[in-house]
Amino acid sequence: MSLVMDSLKNLLLSPLRGFIHKDFHDIFERMTLLSKLLFLIVHLVDKLNLWHRLPVLLGLLYLGARRHLHQEYNLINVGKTPIGVRSNPADHPYRTADGKYNDPFNEGAGSELSFFGRNMLPVDQHNQLKKPDPMVVATKLLARRNFVDTGKQFNMIAASWIQFMIHDWIDHLEDTKQIELKAAEEVASQCPLKSFKFFKTKEIPTGFYEIKTGHLNTRTPWWDGSAIYGSNAEVLKKVRTFKDGKLKLSADGLLEIDKNGKIISGDVRNTWAGLSALQALFVQEHNSVCDALKKEYPELEEEDLYRHARLVTSAVIAKVHTIDWTVELLKTDTLLAGMRANWYGLLGKKFKDTFGHVGGSILGGFVGMKKPENYGVPYSLTEEFTSVYRMHQLLPDKLQLRNIDATPGPNKSLPLTNEIPLEDLIGGKGEENLSKIGFTKQMVSMGHQACGALELWNYPVWMRDLIPQDVDGTDRPDHIDLAALEIYRDRERSVARYNEFRRGMLQIPISKWEDLTDDEEVINTLGEVYGDDVEELDLMVGMAAEKKIKGFAISETAFFIFLVMASRRLEADRFFTSNYNEETYTKKGLEWVNTTESLKDVLDRHYPEITEKWMNSSSAFSVWDSTPQPHNPIPLYFRVPPQ
């Protein structure tokens, strides 16, 4: 009987095998019936390269189908999962210092020093760590020749913001063993460093049969504001005043400096003036929440004020990222609708504000769902997520300081006073310069300057001779070539190279360089570095070379990781789902989050003159002298992208 069924199944599926790309035959066989149907739809649309040209509603259906597939097949646990151990959420109605006890079924999920997960199985490259030479790749394909920016779409605040998020989410524990990379003779004369030393990523046995070793995250991957609060009790103690629930902040609105000359903040490693300005802004936000809560609820203890204010501030950060930063990064109507649906659901803000969370995640959004959803895989951020967030091309060579004493011109533009090299704005020297520049001038200058584009030949050369820091912000003695190091890190951490990565994300792989780009110079240089073997192409290089979707500042390959992981950061966290309520946040706290829609709202709260005098754009993340978004009378879901 089973033989007959198999024959019948093969008969039915054989026409499909001709349609489905050969690399997906095996996984298609293993899929459930629903997943098979969704895959066929997604695969057809991919073959036609159509999804981003579809009407908004159809585009959302495609993204929903693709996200479902990734939730089924691209969430892989690393390490053991406790069985039969459960904590009571009522015992921890607040975000803990080290991220523990968020998940009642797995107290360590999302905590400091938990494992990075995976979106696909690791691809061991330990015998190919230097093939091709990372310094050759960095020199011939990454190093900036002429600065290319993002036009009016994305500014330096947006570039600083993503580092602010990375310092909340991810950092790898390093080994004590050093490795040295030496420049190959063919590129040595073009490398700022002829060789450099760095610490390898520490490999830890997982005690699990499928993925035997993994890497630990020294930051808490929950969206818990750890860039300002820290990822453990020791750092948290340093940043708190223990008065009215507040955090330390200097009188000039910047981060406090300790007796050793280092900034006091939740994360002080590899910082720069743009990042610490945002850290300072959200310390102000936390402290303002404390004031509002104390006024509303004078009976609250100091610890409760801190706990509620942390919940509120973390949620504001998550909301700004979801419906403001990401919308500017992926500037299309489809993603405007998609990101707002993540927070508010398809029924929208007005409906949710009036009736509360109605329906499941699709209609009501992830925020306020009845219970968190992790699809049977403990929450973590992943190695692949880390890899697609390699975005140092966003940084220019110089910050253009604006004259805030001048009368603003058309579109609130401001004249330049001078340019300051980015090297002078990183680390301790950067903090000294920031204190001279001041918060307002720094923020306005970043607002008016476009950031770099995520393209080939746009990686800052000054970052190829960089002083890295320890976790406590102390400079290390050995300079590094960050461009070459990033290529090495992906290989060292067994992250698939570009083509295998695409297969892992159910994207059609390339078969020749011309599938990736039309640019003849890029095609020739790829051939020079990688030969004819497209399988050798490094992920970071492939994403930079890839033809971008109109309106996207990132590659489609990176975006599909975002698609699953951005949703996961909200839906797997009980403080955005079952505990997103007045009891946990307080009524005033929840109202604070629900009435904050953008970074502009946060700036307005603390520096109303900044946006009023100097910001013309709709979003604080687009260049400030750009034209505001015009009103579109066509309802969002019925819009059609320009073809």
UniProtKB/Swiss-Prot annotation:
Active-site residues (renumbered): H167 (proton acceptor)
Pfam families: An_peroxidase
Protein role: Alpha-dioxygenase that catalyzes the primary oxygenation step of a variety of 14-20 carbon fatty acids, containing up to three unsaturated bonds, into their corresponding 2R-hydroperoxides. Involved in the production of oxylipins that function in cell signaling, wound healing, and protection from infection.
InterPro entries: A_dioxygenase, Haem_peroxidase_animal, Haem_peroxidase_sf, Haem_peroxidase_sf_animal, Oxylipin_biosynth_metab
Cofactor, free-text remark: Binds 1 heme b (iron(II)-protoporphyrin IX) group per subunit. Binds 1 calcium ion per subunit.
Residues that hold Ca(2+) according to the record: D168, T220, W222, D224, S226
MF terms in GO: heme binding; metal ion binding; oxidoreductase activity, acting on single donors with incorporation of molecular oxygen, incorporation of two atoms of oxygen; peroxidase activity
Name of the gene encoding the protein in the UniProt record: PIOX
Enzyme Commission numbers on file: 1.13.11.92
Protein name according to UniProt: Alpha-dioxygenase PIOX
Domain of life: Eukaryota
Substrates-to-products reaction catalysed: a 1,2-saturated fatty acid + O2 = a (2R)-2-hydroperoxy fatty acid; (9Z,12Z,15Z)-octadecatrienoate + O2 = (R)-2-hydroperoxy-(9Z,12Z,15Z)-octadecatrienoate; (9Z,12Z)-octadecadienoate + O2 = (2R,9Z,12Z)-2-hydroperoxyoctadecadienoate
Site residues, Transition state stabilizer: R269
Cofactor: heme b; Ca(2+)
UniProt keyword annotations, A-Z: Calcium, Dioxygenase, Fatty acid biosynthesis, Fatty acid metabolism, Heme, Iron, Lipid biosynthesis, Lipid metabolism, Metal-binding, Oxidoreductase, Oxylipin biosynthesis, Peroxidase, Plant defense
Similarity annotation: Belongs to the peroxidase family.
Record's note on what induces expression: Induced by the elicitor harpin (HrpN) from Erwinia amylovora and infection with E.amylovora. Induced by infection with the bacterial pathogens Pseudomonas syringae pv syringae and Pseudomonas syringae pv tabaci. Induced by salicylate (SA), wounding, jasmonate (JA), paraquat and 3-amino-1,2,4-triazole (3AT).
Binding site for heme b: H172, H392, R489, R493
Biological process terms in GO annotation: defense response; fatty acid biosynthetic process; oxylipin biosynthetic process; response to oxidative stress
